[in-house]
Amino acid sequence: MFAIVGHFGTNTVAATLDYLKEKGIPMVYAATGIEDLYQEGATGNDKVIYPVQPIYNSEGRVLLARAVAPTDNGVGLGGTKIGVVATTDDAGSGLVYGVKKQAETLDVEIVYQDVDAAATDYSAAVNVLKNNGCDVVIACMNQAPLATLMASMRDADYNVDVITSYVSASAVTLGAFVENGSVTADRRVYSTAWLDTSTEEGMADYMTFYGAMSAWELENGGTGNDYALNSYAMAGYIAGDIFIQALKALDESGLELNWANFNDIMEATEFKLPMGGTISFANGDRLAVTSLALNTISLEYGESGYYELELVSPIMSLEDVLATIK
């Protein structure tokens, strides 16, 4: 086996990372954001792991940058004192790690509150942030705890904007918050996104994906539309595309196809993600993608007849977001 391309399942990935490193088998793309994938300056066989989709640890850095960045052109939320509510599970701990990591380079006051992911009321944490005058809240958590947080903010009449992970970027989930009054014009929820088809380039990439998937389905007894909007199909496609980009770069270099040369090429190449931004694995950094867009949920039904995600700011690299902060 030369490489694992598209490694799926949080538990599966977590259980096999050490084995892949031990054997030196490259892994390109993991369909999970667990913090075990996060590495800074990896060396030796640790370098063979190449995560692509956002890792909580890295995304936390983006959340803080977007929370503090100026509101010009929708780049950020313009926060001056940031409240962080983090669940004590893997998602919360990973995201808050990233927040604290990025805070090392930003002159901003932050108030942290830990909560139990299974709790049904976060009023104590919410009141701490409200009483401290936090004007933006970062929600380091998954969808279910986010619902609890938003309801607690509603009940406390705490009207500030909230920013959270792409894992909660669901029009159904966020639309329900509008319905129950947790989200209002004075208390918006913003979420990141690592894929964006709202741009001409993004839609062109999607149509290329659609064409490839449709052709494969028709050749294999499908309808040609079975996986057009399937997130797992997109994940597998992106994994394969990154791998092919690496093989093409290796071929153009004239180097022999082996693990050592493949790993060198992976570190030397800046990859373009279909429907997304760019990603680099240089210098042993395994941060996954940190070029993310910013969305919010509509406050009224859109043309679809449902609440819709609205693009606030297109995909920007973390470096570009940070450059807007004075």
Q: What are the functions of these language-model segments?
A:
Residues 60-62, 115-129:
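Structural motif
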Residues 224-227, 248-264:
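Short, charged, surface-exposed loops that flank catalytic or proteolytic processing sites
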Residues 59, 63, 95, 142-145, ...:
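Catalytic-loop motifs flanking and including active-site residues across diverse enzymes
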Residues 2-114, 161-191, 197:
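Extracytoplasmic ligand/sensor domains, especially the bilobed periplasmic-binding protein
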Residues 1-3, 131-136:
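Short acidic/histidine-rich motifs immediately flanking catalytic phosphotransfer sites
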Residues 270-326:
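Solvent-exposed, acidic/polar segments of extracytosolic/periplasmic ligand-binding ectodomains
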Residues 10-23, 99, 121, 136-156, ...:
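Hydrophobic alpha-helical
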